[in-house]
Amino acid sequence: MTTNHLENKVHAATESLFYFSNEFPKRDLQDLFRQAHTRSKLAQHKCLAQFIQDATQTVKQEIQGLSMKLQHLFKPLESVLTWAEDHELREGALSGAIDGVLLIVAQMTTLIGYLENNTAKMDDIATASLAGLGVGLLTACAVSSASTIADLSATGADAVRTAFRLGVHVYYVSQTLEALDPSARPETWAYVINNVTPTEAQEQLDTLYANSTQPATSKVFISALSRSSVTVSGPPARLKALVTGSEFFRTSRYIALPVYGGLCHAPHVYGQDDVDMVMQSRAFSVQKAPATHLKSVWSTSSGYPYLVEDSKSLFASVVAELLTKAICWDSVVSSIVKYTGLTDASEMIIYNYGNSIPLNELESALKSSPAKLKVVNSNLLSWMGHNSPTSVKPRNTLQSKLAIVGMSCRLPGGATSNELFWDVLRRGVDTSQVIPADRFDVATHYDPAGKQLNKSMTQYGCFIDEPGLFDAPFFNMSPREAQTVDPQMRLALVTAYEALEQAGYVANRTASTRLERIGTYYGQAADDYREVNQGQEVSTYYIPGGCRAFGPGRINYFFKFAGPSYSIDTACSSGLAAVEVACQALWRGDVDTAVTGGVNILTNPDGFTGLCSGHFLSKGHNACKTWDATADGYCRADGVGSLVIKRLEDAEDDNDNILGVILGAGTNHSAQAVSITHPHAGHQAYLARQVLRQAGVDPLDVSYVELHGTGTQAGDSEEMQGILDVYAPLSKRRSQSQPLHIGAVKANMGHSESSAGTTALVKVLLMLQNNVIPPHIGITTEMNPKFGHDFKKRNLHIPFELTPWEHTDDKRRIAVVNNFGAAGGNTTMILEDAPMRSISQSDTRKTHVVVLSAKTKTSLVANVDRLISYIDSHPDTQIANVSYTTTARRYQHVLRVAISTSEIAHLQKQLYSHREKIEYIQPVRKAEPPPVAFSFTGQGASHKSMNLELYRDVPTFREFVHQLDSLTRAQGFESFICALDGSHDKDHQHSPVVTQLALVCSEIALAKYWASIGVLPNIVIGHSLGEYAAMHIAGVISASDAIFLVGRRAQLLQERCKIGSHLMMAVRASVDQITQSAAGKPFTVACVNGPADTVLAGTKEEIEVIKTPLESSGLQCIKLDVAFAFHSEQTDPLLDDFEALAKSGVIFAEPKLPVISPLLGKVIFDAKTINATYVRRATREAVDFLAALNNAQEIGAIGGDTVWVEIGPHPVCTGFVRSTIPSVKLALPSFRRGEENWKTLSDSIAQLYTVGVDIDWTELHRPFEKNLRLLDLPTYAFNEKTYWLQYKGDWCLTKGNTFYADEQKIVRGQLPSVSELHTSTVQQIVEQVFDTDTGSCTVVIESDMMQPDFLAAAHGHRMNDCGVATSSIHGDIAFTLAEHIHKKLGVHGKDTRYNVANLQVTKALVARKNTANPQVIRVTASTTDVRSGIDLVWQNINANGDSAEPFATSSIHAGISTDWISSWSSLTHLVRDRIETLDRLVAEGKANRLSHNMAYTLFASNLVDYADKYRGMQSVVMHGLEGCADVELSTKESGVWTVPPYFIDSVAHLAGFIMNCSDAIDAKKFFCITPGWKTMRFARPLVPGARYQSYVKMIPTVEDDTAYFGDVYILQDGVIIGLVEGIEFHRYRRILLERLFSAPDSTNLDDTTETKDISSSTQHSVPVSRQVPPAAKSSAQTVFESSLPFAVPGPRKSTARPAVDEIAAREKPVASQSSSITNRAMQLIADEVGVELADLCDDVGFSDLGVDSLMSLVIADTFRATLDIKVNGSLFLDYETIGDLRNWLEETYA
């Protein structure tokens, strides 16, 4: 045994003791656990969360070890914390085990959380002793065994395991002593007897049992003792008999203890075996920490610390004590007092969970001890307040609260905005109305009696006004598409945009708005528009415009969100269920932003009829009569709502406005309801409690519940019961300060079904914003009598008028939205107030940029008007917030207005002014912003000392400057910061070194700042000293080298030149004018800045001399305030040394941007021009700014559209630019001397924005963002028109027929039902005749291509996204028939193999899209003598059973495999040599090796997309038209084949790959296909999983440069075992691909045959509009099938291509036809898109018209059919604008 650690510890002035009681804390246990759960979500409480998780997992494991009878006592366990509220479980059979676990969990969660908040307190535990009573001793064991806070999770879980096992074991043993009735109230196993001594009590018991025959195990005994009381324990019946029958005990004051779990502290019942059973090794994870690491634990039986070897034995000792030893707390108190008396301590800190009698006894004893200790009582519960912290980061996304940051709606009653919706609610409006005519004709579809078929019994509903209103061009839809697209989708798009706009969303602005991390989730339960409106005339957009998945998909596509998009249908709860799914995605971390909502637009009369028939609907003229006694069903309603949700911490980081916070959400199902459509109160209550637990919310803290409240008797009463049970129970009543209000929006807006939950959620958010609960208008007679009359007792209220719902600082408002669906789903969501926000300081900028933009001028005018109205209503709005909201938090469109302003009044005035000019605004081209030129100012433009506000306000600019200053000081130069930061007066003169470095470095920093806010230069120019900054920004020199050159040059100037000896003078004249006016006086030109701007330099005397005649001539002369005369002879003394320094110390690189050189008067692009000599010359020679600009303009480097930004302290170069290039529209300064930086910058930024430069507004505002607020400005003003397909007539009443079903039976019945031969491609023999004497036969088979294996084989070879029968399918058919015929005629031998020869495919066999219809082919095999071969013919069969012209022919010849291999052996070494050569070329980098994935990806992108089974090539080597491949055949088998097509293709389609993927063929313009081959033979079977090599070389023919031939060799283990000889390929223009390979039932083709005849195809991209006369057509009809593109060497004569020749011979249209064709094409486009011809301006893009891929196909097909212009849909990608297409048409037909 080891010694206890108290003997070895170093004593301190303060001793610590942790006391773990056997009683629960006085605080409400549910509330305690709720707080623990809430705090476990925070990042600082990871150990707390881990303990709760470990404890939960531990009890789950223990429950699994129980008998099934006991397991059934437990409900599914989410968290051990939930046991606190399970009263049934706590009062049941295992109450001892349950309460033991809960006590430990309560103590451990409190302790761990306390230590995580106060980590230093772990040191107190390390030196403390531990005391406890009962199960509390197990908590002490856990703490004793832990060395760190993290250890407490594992040791605490073991304490939980021990307590549970102990409780279960005690239950089992106690049941053997006295079996209790589980249905009766639990009875106690212990009484405390007061005012008696242990001796007296024991004497009484001894006397009582002296002559008793009771078994010892049934006797009452003393289980705990103290000086003045004892606790007696025993079986309940025996114990009750004792205290009522014994006079001694009856007359003593006794109290029944809450001990219901069984007997403990009973040495006569338990022994070591019982201890061992509890401590069994199964799943016990206590780490055996040595005794030296343990804290001392005081034994309650001996009064001394346990003497143990390790932590496990400590647990075992405590278990033994709890089972077999009586409690003697007095001895513990005495020992602690005695121990402390031996120390030097003057103070004892007792950590505990609240006052208790044992703890008070200990405190009293310590205080009265001789040591007179000061006792400090430290309550561990103190850290856990009643309100959870609001500003602490969550532990991970699962623990995050969620913030709703944007919302928008379209609802009945004219509620087309959030504000109008609130107005409807506030005024208590019932929005029901007669069904409007745009939905359907009520007169013909209404029958109140319900006797007429398919008619509705109600004529009322709640409807959105004009649901067809939509801005189609804004959302890139054509009018035709917009009209077809379901208005649910359209309004989802619109409300999503508005919600995102309210949220201040800009793509990729922050981490949470990355496009890849945004998903959409929308609820939709009906497809009315598709079923009725669209269904009247099914068109191109029927599927993408009507199928539900396209709703959220369209939102993702429009906004380019790359996250998930879900359409969710849970009936009436779809909307809120979609929001809940979005929340779960945010909690899981799947997305960072969710756009979610619900949609419902009613147009189908069947919905009304069906719901009336199911008794769902009210017949009256009212919205839902929610909670009314006469409620008779609900009123159907429209509704569309969208919300934007983020995690709360992201929303706060993003500076979003938070409308409300989601604490929890969940969905379950009413599985026990009486019917699927009937709600269930129990399941709704279960869900509510579950979500409340997860959210950590006390139900009594909920102050408002928005109920589903449909106005049905069943739904309302069930829902109300669930709400009352959870939120307003009678068992635990609400206080007067906790009123609960309930409401239901359906009383106003009707039941919008799949949008109902979204509507309710928006209502609650508006209530939070407005601090008012709107009146409930559903009760018009009296309240539903089923609800009872105890609302007052429950403190529950229904508001019948506007009721205040104020926010208070000390208490958050919590609301619940409850929603359920007719399919049985229930969804609940808990919300609370947004956290309060405060602004610490205001924006230091005085001038700001406010912008407005739109896609149309109409919208822009309306946007301006809306902002003016907003300012009128909010005159106190801060201009900084308007700027922030309109710039950084709004999408920017092509029509733009920008205003630089400093006050609201000025802004409003400017808005009026700009409104009048909108007519003249031109749209910017976002894809082509104007080029930007940076001009860098030279010396002398600024004050001697600057005070840059940009340096003061912007950390990034300041950091740029500091980095440059650090480089400056590192090179030994003086810091230049003092010349920029305002620390000196503006006229303070600095040294030349500081002045020049300050100028260049501030310009570098300024250029980088412009770049950081999105303004990047395309070209640069520097004036004099500014050229160094320009060179750095262009990438010629590094910043360090720029500083080196400028600093050393300035030093040399100081050392070699005298300040003031020379001057520079600006003259407002040209050099010629100066020459004429100089009167012969000499002068030096330093700078030629413009046509009339020249700077002279010279000695002081020279300048004075020249100045006089110049001024006399009327020329303006200004002396420049510079220390030295640059570009003059004054600099001569330093030139040699300066050049040497530059040559040895600086690296000059190739410019990354063009540099306009004022020295050379030209633009520099190369790496050699700027060097050491250049900077020498630039110091001495003249600056010719004029010549430089002229040269740049001449070569096109700059132009009139170039935007100039001057980088420097004052605009100088801008004037030079304007005078030299008058066409320049914008030349803008960065700073202006004497003007605040932000004023100048704002003015320039505003102008840059209006010409199309994309400003990074987020970066511009970043330094000030926390002081800015996103305003809820008016939404974008859409330019809406009505797009609506009206339901016509009454066909919904009369629909139904069986015509198509009967037709299908006829067609399906054409094939016989049985067949002697049946494979996947040879399915039915319809005729066969054999003559064994002559060897003749005829066999006719038919196969349906729609048979799954056949169809899969075709779709395994996809071209133009269609399944195409590869030639290898025809090969398999041929092999199958050959083997069948030879076997039938008795001529099939062991080594017999078959040669499929002379295959010619004249038409492609393309699979139908509609697989419901059969697609039958017939193959006829015939021969007069099988030894001479068999002829095969392929034909299509139509629905009537008639055969079409043959589309393929072939012949079959038998051969001997060994003969073939022998004949090929002479070629083997040649083929192997070519393969080795190809491998060598790869090693030399002259050939390409492609991997499996790369090869097939390339193949798919160029022509054929193969299924996995076809993808046998593992690697490919390609060199021109020659190649080889390593092949491994698939082992995945399906179907019945003779030679599987995917085996043939795998070994042979190398030829097709070469022809379509080699760089020898232009795959962008052409594709290559094969009509067949000469022979195809395999000497060995093709085996699954076997490996082969293929080799081919394709050779163009001499006769036809579009025809190629080759031989494909197949090798196995170096031996040729197969040959596809004479495979043929022809090259076609890619524009023909769609024409040749489209499904026969495709709607965009006029050819409806089963195969695609390409005999009329052409190589010309645009065939003529005039038809060829019949006489010109060729008789031959050779056509080429897509199939297996293989190919090979060995030229032979090309097959005839008369069809191609015929088309090539067509005449081009004459020039006079071109304009006609162009005009007709434009009209066709206008008709298809649904716009006026006048709208098709040249600069209009097809994407702007809504021409997507589908519309492209439609227009292309219309061109083919009407104009005979054969194009495909990619035409509108190649020619993006109307003008581009118009030019192409004109050029083609000119």
Curated annotation (Swiss-Prot):
Residues 1644-1667 are annotated as: Disordered. Residues 1715-1789 form the Carrier domain. Keywords: Multifunctional enzyme, Phosphopantetheine, Phosphoprotein, Transferase. It comes from the Eukaryota. The modification O-(pantetheine 4'-phosphoryl)serine is found at residue 1749. Residues 1357-1631 are annotated as: Product template (PT) domain. It is an enzyme of class 2 (transferase). The keyword Transferase applies. The active site is at residues 572, 708, 751, 1357, 1545. Residues 1323-1475 are annotated as: N-terminal hotdog fold. Signal peptide: none annotated. Residues 399-833 form the Ketosynthase family 3 (KS3) domain. PANTHER family: FATTY ACID SYNTHASE, SI:DKEY-61P9.11. Multidomain protein; including a starter unit:ACP transacylase (SAT) that selects the starter unit; a ketosynthase (KS) that catalyzes repeated decarboxylative condensation to elongate the polyketide backbone; a malonyl-CoA:ACP transacylase (MAT) that selects and transfers the extender unit malonyl-CoA; a product template (PT) domain that controls the immediate cyclization regioselectivity of the reactive polyketide backbone; and an acyl-carrier protein (ACP) that serves as the tether of the growing and completed polyketide via its phosphopantetheinyl arm. Non-reducing polyketide synthase; part of the gene cluster that mediates the biosynthesis of the bianthraquinone cladofulvin, a conidial pigment not required for virulence but that plays a role in fitness and resistance to environmental stresses including UV light and low-temperature stress. The pathway begins with the synthesis of atrochrysone thioester by the polyketide synthase (PKS) claG. The atrochrysone carboxyl ACP thioesterase claF then breaks the thioester bond and releases the atrochrysone carboxylic acid from claG. This is Atrochrysone carboxylic acid synthase. It comes from Passalora fulva.
